[in-house]
Amino acid sequence: MTRTDTHAPLSQDALARLAGVIESRKPANGGDPDKSYVARLLHKGPDAFLKKVGEEATEVVMAAKDLDHGADKAKLVYEVADLWFHSMIALAHYGLAPADVIAELERREGISGIEEKALRKAAARSSEEGGA
């Protein structure tokens, strides 16, 4: 078996392990804001960690654009890792886990992006009509 063959399960395991660490760093679970970056962000509340998600998303965009001008691909990977990490903090705060995101991606598998977007628009219209 090659590394490519085992990449997905290892990635999911790594995400699950990281999610466990983040969960353990929640102040409610004994995470100390003076000793843990995750605990500090969670202690400060959603504004703090959501600001970081926004900053990291912007850095992903900038790193991707830099690739068009010869930048190293590793920079994009680094920034996406930061975005995923901070997004996982947000997920944990709201009682969610990477498995929830993976389940949603699996749900979308085989559905074209155009079709999926049309289904969301139809559902939104239906909700608006039912609520009016």
Curated annotation (Swiss-Prot):
Q: Keyword check for Nucleotide-binding, yes or no.
A: yes
Q: In which pathway does it act?
A: Amino-acid biosynthesis; L-histidine biosynthesis; L-histidine from 5-phospho-alpha-D-ribose 1-diphosphate: step 2/9
Q: In terms of domain of life, where is this protein from?
A: Bacteria
- GO biological process annotations for this chain's record? L-histidine biosynthetic process
Q: Which SUPFAM superfamilies match?
A: all-alpha NTP pyrophosphatases
Its keywords, alphabetically, are: Amino-acid biosynthesis, ATP-binding, Cytoplasm, Histidine biosynthesis, Hydrolase, Nucleotide-binding
Q: What class of enzyme is it?
A: hydrolase
Q: Give the catalytic activity.
A: 1-(5-phospho-beta-D-ribosyl)-ATP + H2O = 1-(5-phospho-beta-D-ribosyl)-5'-AMP + diphosphate + H(+)
Q: What is its EC number?
A: 3.6.1.31
Task: Provide the protein's localization.
Answer: Cytoplasm
NCBIfam families documented for this protein: histidine_hisI, PRK00400.1-3
**What is the protein's given name?**
Phosphoribosyl-ATP pyrophosphatase
Q: Which gene encodes it?
A: hisE
